[in-house]
């Protein structure tokens, strides 16, 4: 019997961990949307750990794309060029968009 393929969100998480590992421990969580109103996801990063939270109230594709966005933020935080949170772009600076563009395009080729 053919082994059942994991859900898209799990495949995306595993692909990111393997292909774009981070220099710290990473945990990925799904929370109910009432715990994070108006957000699909967020990331918390410190020197030893990264926590990514994605709302449960999304389909597999939307949750996967949100995970890629949050992973891109985490990768951006590891660059030697610091994020200027006070600028107009803030955390969505040109480096973030380069990282996000690369990841989302590769992911679309995988599915």
PLM segments and residue spans:
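Zn2+-dependent metallopeptidase catalytic core
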Residues: 4-24
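Hydrophobic (often cysteine-bearing) scaffold residues that line and stabilize catalytic clefts
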Residues: 8, 64, 68, 88, ...
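Short, solvent-exposed loop/turn segments at secondary-structure junctions
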Residues: 32-34, 72, 81-82
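Short pre-active-site segment immediately N-terminal to the catalytic Zn-binding motif
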Residues: 50-67
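Active-site recognition of the HExxH zinc-binding catalytic motif
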Residues: 65-78
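Post-HExxH zinc-binding segment in Zn-dependent metallohydrolases
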Residues: 81-111
């Amino acid at each position: 019997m053919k082994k059942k393929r994991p859900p898209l969100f799990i495949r995306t998480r595993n692909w990111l961990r393997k292909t774009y590992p981070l220099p710290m421990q990473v945990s990925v969580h799904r929370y109910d949307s009432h715990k994070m109103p108006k957000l699909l996801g967020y990331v918390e990063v410190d020197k030893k750990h990264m926590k990514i939270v994605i709302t449960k109230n999304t389909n597999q594709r939307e949750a996967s794309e949100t995970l890629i966005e949050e992973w891109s933020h985490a990768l951006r935080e590891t660059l030697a060029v610091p994020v200027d949170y006070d600028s107009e772009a803030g955390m969505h600076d040109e480096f973030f968009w380069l990282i996000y563009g690369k990841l989302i395009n590769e992911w679309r080729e995988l599915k």
